[in-house]
Amino acid sequence: MRKNLHSNIVKSIIGIALLAFLSSCNSDPLGTTEPPVDTNNPIEYSPGSADFSNYVAIGNSLTAGFVDGALYNLGQQKSIPALLAGQLRAAGGQAVFNQPSVNSDYGCSNPGSGCTLGKYKLDADIPGPSPTINGDPITAYAGDKSSLHNFGVPGIQVGQLLTPDTGTPGTAAFSPYYARFASSPGTSTILGDVISTDPSFFSLWIGNNDVLGYATSGATNEAIFTDPAA
């Protein structure tokens, strides 16, 4: 009796395991395959009450497309605003989303040292990521500055949106990433340039660098925060 019970339990376990194995052989067990597109009845998207005809983005590194420790072509092409603009296009967004291209496949990971090093890459032969050997200098944007839609500037804090010092070399707020596409370096501000485009819709990602700098300094320098009265 006990032997038969043991045999039945073993058979049940084997049966369940076999069933689970066969189920796992499903080429799409999570149902992630998208259903076929009905080309005869395309989906129509509506913007609702929003107007996406002139979408602009304001922010820091994530907005600019800064990845792998540098700003370079592929990162800009895959920036969050660029991806968002592509989706908004289906609901009346602009056909082209202009970004201040750096025209560099490697970017610059050490702007304070002459951009001798480019983006970081993962090398399994050494511990941690290493920069590519050659970086490219941060040069002025050669395109039409008045038609830009992405005003992301890597590393900036809230206050740097409001001051012309962000485009003025030698000042504490200076950023070469803004100076390169500023409408009037040393005079214009990021926010002023944004407003001049008369956006119909915008996204804003800013403020995390204010907190991050305070945290990474050991919470010892409250002056790093943007002045709330500014």
Task: Show the residue positions of the predicted features.
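Catalytic nucleophile-elbow at a beta strand-turn-alpha helix junction centered on a G-D-S/GDSL motif
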Residues: 53-69
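Sec-dependent N-terminal signal peptides
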Residues: 12-20
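Conserved SGNH/GDSL esterase-like catalytic core that processes O-acyl groups on lipids
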Residues: 71-229
